[in-house]
Swiss-Prot record:
GO molecular function, one term: fatty acid binding
Keyword Transmembrane carried by entry: no
Alphabetically ordered keywords of this record: FAD, Fatty acid metabolism, Flavoprotein, Lipid metabolism, Oxidoreductase, Peroxisome, Phosphoprotein
Modified residues (Phosphoserine): 10
EC assignment: 1.3.3.6
Record protein name field: Peroxisomal acyl-coenzyme A oxidase 3
Matching Gene3D superfamilies: Butyryl-CoA Dehydrogenase, subunit A, domain 2 (2.40.110.10), Butyryl-CoA Dehydrogenase, subunit A, domain 3 (1.20.140.10)
Motif Microbody targeting signal, residue numbers: 698-700
Positions where Phosphothreonine occurs in the chain: 281
Cofactor or coenzyme needed: FAD
InterPro entries in the record: ACO, ACOX_C_alpha1, Acyl-CoA_Oxase/DH_mid-dom, Acyl-CoA_Oxase/DH_mid-dom_sf, Acyl-CoA_oxidase, Acyl-CoA_oxidase_C, AcylCo_DH-like_C, AcylCoA_DH/oxidase_NM_dom_sf
Residues bearing the modification N6-succinyllysine: 505
Length: 700
C-alpha cells in the first residue's frame, strides 16, 4: 500500500524503484503519496522536485566519494555553487512571498545537499538582506537589488571574540559626529573583534554590524545595527580602517568562510544606521518609537529569533536524513535469524526498532512544529512592516521568542543524539564517511551553540514561564496568549491535583495520555522552579544568584518539558484536522503517541516524585506501550521515510538508496573512489631501509 497514487498528481513523484525495500513498502498500512500530499502540499512538492533535479543535472554540483578538497578550493566551489543557485532564480522574492513556506523549503533542500552552501546563501539573502529590509527604512531599500544580484555580498556581525550570548555587553562602538553627520565605528581592543561571522572570512563586502550607539554628550543608547562596507566590491581588498580575516578550519561546514573584523575609527554616513528601532535626525537628535530600552533591543535583535527558528528546521533536516539512512539500511541489512539458514532484516529486532523509530517519530513531530513556528514568525514580521506595534503583537513576539529559545535546544539536541544513534545502528558501515553520518554529525554540532548556546537559551524560556506565575494566575484568573501555548496554565492549580489513573498499556496508547501527563509535568516543574527561585532569593538576596541556582533541577527541565509539550500538542492537533483519511490518522497518531511517550519516559522520576503516577505497573505499562508502538510502526517505517527523504543524489549515502540494493551500491561506491586500486604513492618508503629496529637507540 506504500506506493504512489495513480492520479494526475502522480507526476509530482518519482516512481519508487523495485528492489529489496519493495517488501516493506508493500506492507505499509497507508499510501505514501497521499501522506506526502498531506504533509507538504502540491506546490511545495513541485518546488522540492525542481530544486533536487536542477542540482542533480548541473555538473557544478556533482560529487565524488572520498574527494577532500583543500580549504581554499572548497570555499571557491561553495561560492560558485551559491552564485549558481541565485542564477537559477530560486530566491525570487515575489515567488517566495506568494508562499513564504517556500523560504524554509528552499533552505532545507539546499541544506540536504550541503549546509555550507545553504548557510552561505541564507546568511547573505535571508539574514543580511532581511535585516536590511526589516530593520532599515525606505532609504536602505536601494541595497536590496544589489543584494539579490550579488553586486554586494553580506553578513551579520553581532558576536565578538569575548561576548556572544550576552548581547548587551558587546563592545564595538559607534560615536556620532554631528559636524560631519557620520558615525565613527571602532573596536576598542582585539577582544571586541567581531568573530565567528559567516561569509566574513573571505567573501563579504558588506556587514550589518551591531555597535553601542554614543551621542556627542556621551549618552549611550545601546546596541544598534549599521550597514558597513567591509571590502571593495571589485577587488575584495579591505576598506580603510578595517582589519578582516578568516578564523580557520572548523569541525564541519568548512565551505562556509567564518571570519573576524576589527574597526579602527571607520567613518560611515549617518544614513547607514538601520533606523527602524532608533534614528538620529539631521539636527542631531536621537529618537525611537520604543520608549523601553529592552523593547528596542528586542526589536533590534528580532533577526535572532528568525535565526533560531531556522536552526530548528536545519536540525530537523539532519535528523530526517539520519533516520532515512538508518531505516533503509536496517530494512535491507540481514543478520542472524531463527535458524542458521535464515537471516532477517535488523529492523525486525525490537531493540533496533526501539533505537531508531522514536527518532523517526521525533522527525515528524519536530518537522511540523518547525513549519508552524516559521509561519508564526512571518506573521510577526509582516505586522512589524505594517507598523503594528500593538500590545498584542508585542506579546506575540514575546511568545515566539520563548518558543524559539527552547525549540532550538530541543531540536538540535534531539538531532545530535539521533544522528549518533543512527550511526551506531548502521554498525561499521555507518562509520564509513561516504555514508554521511560524520558530515551530518559535524554539520549539526554548531546548531547546539550558535545563535545562542542551548543551555543559556533555555533560561529565556523558563524566565518567560516564571513571569506568568503571578498571584492572579495562581488564583485561577483567566489567562491566554496569542498562540495559546500557555493557555492551559489557566487551570494551573487544578492540573497540579491531577493523577494518572490508568495502569495498563492501553491507557497509554492514545496521544491524549502523554499530553495530559505533560501538562501536569510543566505545572509541577513551574511550581518547583518558582519555589527554588524564591528560596534562593530569600537566602542569598541576589536575583542573579537565585536564577543561576534554580537552573539544574528546575528551570532547565521546565523549559524542555514545556517545549516537548508544545511540539506534541501541535502535532496532535494537525493529525486530528478534518479531511484526514483513517489510514493516515492511524499511522500519524502512532507517531505522535510514540514521540510523546518516548520523551515522557525521560521524566519518569519526576512523574513518580510528584505523585502523578504510582505503582510499578504504571511505569511498565508505559514501556510496553512504547515497544508496541515501535512494532506497529515497523512495517510503515520505510514508507514513512519515503515521504521525508530527498532524492538519492541529494541524500548521497550508498547504503540508503531508494532501491535498497545495499551491498551493490556500497561496493560500487567504494570502487569508484580515486586511486582505490592503486598502490600507495609512497611505496618506496615501504621497500627501502627495512632494518629500522633499534637503529636510533644509541641516540636516546
Amino acid at each position: 500500500m506504500g506506493s504512489l497514487p495513480e492520479e494526475k498528481d502522480s507526476a509530482l513523484w518519482s516512481d519508487t524503484p523495485k528492489g529489496p525495500l519493495s517488501a516493506y513498502r508493500a506492507r505499509a498500512s497507508f499510501n505514501s503519496g497521499e501522506l506526502l500530499l498531506f504533509w507538504d502540499g502540491q506546490d511545495v512538492i513541485h518546488f522540492k522536485k525542481t530544486i533536487f533535479s536542477t542540482l542533480e543535472n548541473d555538473p557544478l554540483f556533482a560529487r565524488s566519494y572520498g574527494a577532500d578538497l583543500p580549504l581554499e578550493k572548497l570555499r571557491e566551489l561553495n561560492f560558485l555553487r551559491c552564485k549558481r543557485v541565485f542564477e537559477y532564480g530560486f530566491f525570487k522574492v515575489e515567488e517566495l512571498l506568494k508562499n513564504p513556506l517556500k523560504i524554509l523549503v528552499l533552505i532545507n533542500c539546499l541544506g540536504m545537499y550541503d549546509w555550507s552552501l545553504a548557510n552561505k546563501c541564507v546568511l547573505h539573502m535571508l539574514v543580511f538582506g532581511t535585516t536590511v529590509f526589516v530593520s532599515g527604512s525606505e532609504k536602505h531599500f536601494k541595497y536590496l537589488e544589489k543584494i539579490y544580484s550579488l553586486e554586494i555580498f553580506g553578513c551579520f556581525a553581532l558576536t565578538e571574540l569575548s561576548h556572544g550570548s550576552n548581547t548587551k555587553a558587546m563592545r564595538t562602538t559607534a560615536h556620532y559626529d554631528p559636524d560631519t553627520q557620520e558615525f565613527i565605528l571602532h573596536s576598542p581592543d582585539f577582544e571586541a573583534a567581531k568573530f565567528w561571522v559567516g561569509n566574513l572570512g573571505k567573501t563579504a563586502t558588506h556587514a550589518v554590524v551591531f555597535a553601542q550607539l554614543y551621542m556627542p554628550d556621551g549618552q549611550c543608547h545601546g546596541l544598534h545595527s549599521f550597514l558597513v562596507q567591509i571590502r571593495d566590491t571589485k577587488t575584495l581588498l579591505p576598506m580603510t580602517g578595517v582589519m578582516v580575516g578568516d578564523i580557520g578550519k572548523k569541525l564541519g561546514q568548512n565551505g562556509l568562510d567564518n571570519g573576524f573584523a576589527m574597526f579602527n575609527k571607520v567613518r560611515i554616513p549617518r544614513q547607514n544606521l538601520l533606523d527602524r528601532t532608533g534614528n538620529i535626525t539631521s539636527e542631531g537628535t536621537y529618537n525611537s518609537p520604543f520608549k523601553d530600552v529592552r523593547q528596542r533591543l528586542g526589536a533590534s535583535l528580532g533577526s535572532l529569533s528568525s535565526g533560531r527558528i531556522s536552526i530548528i528546521s536545519m536540525s530537523v533536516v539532519n535528523l530526517k536524513l539520519a533516520v532515512s539512512i538508518a531505516i533503509r539500511f536496517s530494512a535491507t541489512r540481514c543478520q542472524f535469524g531463527p535458524t542458521d539458514k535464515e537471516e532477517i532484516p535488523v529492523l525486525e529486532y525490537p531493540l533496533q526498532q526501539w533505537r531508531i523509530l522514536p527518532y523517526l517519530a521525533a522527525a515528524y513531530a519536530l518537522d511540523h512544529f518547525s513549519k508552524t513556528i516559521f509561519m508564526d514568525l512571518i506573521e510577526v514580521q509582516s505586522a512589524r512592516l505594517r507598523g503594528d506595534h500593538s500590545d498584542q503583537q508585542a506579546e506575540l513576539g514575546r511568545e515566539i521568542h520563548a518558543l524559539a529559545s527552547a525549540g532550538k535546544p530541543l531540536a538540535s539536541w534531539t538531532a545530535q543524539r539521533g544522528i549518533q544513534e543512527c550511526r551506531e545502528a548502521c554498525g561499521g558501515h555507518g562509520y564509513l564517511a561516504m555514508n554521511r553520518f560524520g558530515d551530518l554529525r559535524n554539520d549539526n554540532d554548531p546548531n547546539c551553540t550558535y545563535e545562542g548556546d542551548n543551555n543559556v537559551l533555555l533560561q529565556q524560556t523558563s524566565n518567560y514561564l516564571l513571569s506568568l506565575l503571578e498571584p492572579p494566575l495562581q488564583d485561577g484568573a483567566h489567562f491566554t496568549s496569542p498562540l495559546k501555548t500557555v493557555d492551559f496554565l489557566e487551570a494551573y492549580p487544578g492540573i497540579l491535583g491531577q493523577k494518572f489513573l490508568g495502569s495498563s498499556k492501553a491507557d497509554w496508547m492514545d496521544s491524549a495520555a502523554p499530553l495530559a501527563a505533560y501538562r501536569w509535568l510543566v505545572c509541577y516543574l513551574l511550581q518547583e522552579s518558582h519555589r527554588r527561585y524564591c528560596q534562593e532569593k530569600k537566602s542569598r538576596g541576589s536575583d542573579f544568584e537565585a536564577r543561576n541556582n534554580s537552573q539544574v533541577y528546575g528551570c532547565r527541565p521546565l523549559a524542555l518539558a514545556f517545549m516537548e509539550l508544545t511540539v506534541m500538542q501541535r502535532f496532535h492537533e494537525h493529525i486530528h484536522s478534518s479531511g484526514l483519511s483513517p489510514s493516515l490518522r492511524t499511522v500519524l497518531g502512532r507517531l505522535s503517541t510514540l514521540y510523546g511517550l518516548w520523551c515522557l519516559s525521560q521524566h519518569m522520576a519526576l512523574l513518580y516524585r510528584g505523585g502523578y503516577i504510582s505503582g510499578e505497573q504504571t511505569g511498565r505499562a508505559m514501556e510496553d506501550a512504547i515497544l508496541t508502538l515501535c512494532e506497529q510502526l515497523k512495517d510503515d517505517a520505510v514508507a514513512l521515510v519515503d515521504v521525508i527523504a530527498p532524492s538519492d543524489f541529494v541524500l548521497n549515502s550508498p547504503i540508503a538508496k531508494a532501491d535498497g540494493e545495499l551491498y551493490k551500491n556500497l561496493w560500487a561506491a567504494v570502487l569508484q573512489q580515486n586511486g582505490v586500486l592503486e598502490r600507495a604513492a609512497w611505496w618506496p618508503e615501504f621497500s627501502a631501509n627495512k632494518s629500522v629496529a633499534d637503529r636510533l637507540k644509541s641516540q636516546l
